[in-house]
From Swiss-Prot:
Name of this chain's protein: Respiratory nitrate reductase 2 gamma chain
Enzyme Commission number: 1.7.5.1
UniProt membrane topology term: Multi-pass membrane protein
Regions of this protein lying in the Periplasmic compartment: 1-4, 72-83, 150-183
Subunit structure: Dimer of heterotrimers each composed of an alpha, a beta and a gamma chain. Alpha and beta are catalytic chains; gamma chains are involved in binding the enzyme complex to the cytoplasmic membrane.
The protein's role, per its UniProt record: This is a second nitrate reductase enzyme which can substitute for the NRA enzyme and allows E.coli to use nitrate as an electron acceptor during anaerobic growth. The gamma chain is a membrane-embedded heme-iron unit resembling cytochrome b, which transfers electrons from quinones to the beta subunit.
Subcellular localization(s) per the UniProt record: Cell inner membrane
MF terms (GO), sorted A to Z: electron transfer activity; heme binding; metal ion binding; nitrate reductase (quinone) activity; nitrate reductase activity
Cofactor binding, note field: Binds 2 heme groups per subunit. Heme 1 is located at the cytoplasmic interface, heme 2 is located at the periplasmic interface. Electrons are transferred from the periplasmic to the cytoplasmic heme.
Main location: membrane
Top-level taxonomy: Bacteria, Pseudomonadati, Pseudomonadota, Gammaproteobacteria, Enterobacterales
Amino acid sequence: MIQYLNVFFYDIYPYICATVFFLGSWLRYDYGQYTWRASSSQMLDKRGMVIWSNLFHIGILGIFFGHLFGMLTPHWMYAWFLPVAAKQLMAMVLGGICGVLTLIGGAGLLWRRLTNQRVRATSTTPDIIIMSILLIQCLLGLSTIPFSAQYPDGSEMMKLVGWAQSIVTFRGGSSEMLNGVAFVFRLHLVLGMTIFLLFPFTRLVHVWSAPFEYFTRRYQIVRSRR
């Protein structure tokens, strides 16, 4: 039974989540554009919104790009200037800082959403569920740091890296690379994949519409009517 669950969650489940993530996002964009928004509640009440939102977004963006580089970049691309042990230490320190920022900001946003009557009235169940899951995932991520510290050579981290790269390159037997990995890492992986599974059904879809063109657009020319 344990072997079956291991194969399902770490060999099959990643592709289920990825399929729902991409296909669900595409279908929602095509058929539900009126729901494709961040639904900001800042106009309802600004108290605490700016600081909590900034902390949360800075932290979670740092975590996302840190995981993107750390998990998916082939080792040979950085081995000549960044040893595995140094990479793990950097991940623990910077990841820990970003995790704390995300946790503080996310907890503030969730508390505001639950206790502010005006904000609560415009909140949906998926809003509350996805924020709660993100906070739990953040706690799990922070709780992996002591386990990583037990392997200063980065060997535990490289098992996770090997698993992630095996998944994205469609190699079989990916679950075998997680043999001996602490349970908290396994739980962190499953919940992380579940977030991608739920992504198309929440307001997280606004991530796809990040205004990157703002940095390259032409300056607007404003002429007064005189």
